[in-house]
Amino acid sequence: MNLLDNATSCFQKQLPFVLYAKPNETILHGIFQNDETLNVFESQSGFVFASFYSETNVVFPLSNSEVLQEEINFETEDNSFQLETKSNENAQILFEKLVRNGVSEIENNTFEKVVLSRKIEVSQQVDFIKSYQNLLKKYPTAYRYLWFHPRVGLWMGATPEQLAKITNNTFETVALAGTQVFSKTISWQEKEIVEQQLVTDYIKS
């Protein structure tokens, strides 16, 4: 049984698991917790899933998990599909109001930068395994993960940001704000430079 099959089995049994691949690597890692316990991170070795605001961070402890790895199979079929989003006029109105409020707060110097988001609901079932295969194949330079806990939910993503890298006594992180499509020649505009500096200053403080 490969790691994707393992993940499918765990999801059906409602057991916690995480799959992840590091940037520019072709090894897929899997951590499969042996029971459905919601473990709060204290100092255990394991995979930590931390919310930005929550004081409770979840960990899959290595001492109570099966840890596996395998080469990523990139010879998979194209699983791309078009998502059909539910039309919600009220949600659009609320989001536009949120944007106006955000602009107003910036003008009032409440804060310098704000990132707004909204929830999008889709009308069809999504095969999360096929979607994750797409992430693995299409974003090889990103950290690609698929995380599930029955008491928290299922999360999937591909991020170019490096949270932390520690080598001997050197700590490295990435302040990623201004972004654009990668090309051999990149020209950063004033807007991106200012946004980048805001994040850099926040991390340093």
Residue ranges and their predicted role:
Residues 1-39, 122-125, 129:
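Short Lys/Arg-enriched alpha/beta "domain-start" segment
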Residues 14-17, 43-46, 141-144, 153-154:
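Short, surface-exposed beta-edge/turn micro-motifs
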Residues 19, 59-60, 156, 173:
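Generic recognition of long tandem-repeat/solenoid scaffolds
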Residues 22-122, 190-193:
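Non-catalytic accessory segments adjacent to catalytic cores
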Residues 24-26, 53-55, 152, 161-163, ...:
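Short, glycine-/Ser/Thr-/acidic-enriched flexible segments
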Residues 42-44, 163-205:
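Cytosolic ligand/metal-binding cores
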Residues 58-61, 126, 184-185:
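Short, conserved acidic/polar surface loops in the N-terminal third of protein domains
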Residues 73-161, 166, 170, 176-180:
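Intrinsically disordered, low-complexity linker/loop segments enriched in Gly/Pro
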